Amino acid sequence: MARYLGPKAKLSRREGTDLFLKSARRSISDKAKFDSKPGQHGRTSGTRTSDYGLQLREKQKVKRMYGVLEKQFRRYFEEADRRRGNTGANLLSVLESRLDNVVYRMGFGSTRAEARQLVSHKAMTVNGQSVNIPSYMVKAGDVIAVRDKSKKQTRIAEALELAKQVGLPAWVDVNADKGEGTFKKVPDRDEFAADINESLIVELYSR
């Protein structure tokens, strides 16, 4: 499955919720009527979706939200299933620990896609070492920083300004002036993404 490169608002409308694929400074809230499906007049939603359909849609929503393709998503689920505790919550913990997501959460990228690009282009370091793998798993206590030669990028400054306005999550500690932040801990399930029903994904993969 290739990575989707089309209109971001269309994906959010398809899932019926904001996937945060576009920067808040270019909000899609006015353009994407989340209760209206893509199409000239939107698809009717009078027919009842099957349990399988609901499970599949939830998986697609989370994959798109975090920018992960099927093969890798399946590996994350298998890793989550091996861990102790709730498999669904474990899955979200794995996704939240991806380097591109942490860069986004720290405000260095205004979207996960922009954060992924920063990582791929070697603009970020982890504990002083250059890492260009978006799926790199960040651990509690790791320090994520913008490389010196990348600190003058306008998009990073704009993203940090936006993050300053909307606030940062409690599990990261960021020094915007230094261009670095600490991943304090993997967030608890009740700290993020209330619009995700991970139990549907567990049910899907357990079929």
UniProtKB/Swiss-Prot annotation:
Residues 29-38 have a biased composition (Basic and acidic residues). GO terms for biological process: ribosomal small subunit biogenesis; translation. Pfam families: Ribosomal_S4, S4. One of its GO terms (molecular function) is rRNA binding. Belongs to the universal ribosomal protein uS4 family. PANTHER family: 30S 40S RIBOSOMAL PROTEIN, SMALL RIBOSOMAL SUBUNIT PROTEIN US4M. This is Small ribosomal subunit protein uS4.
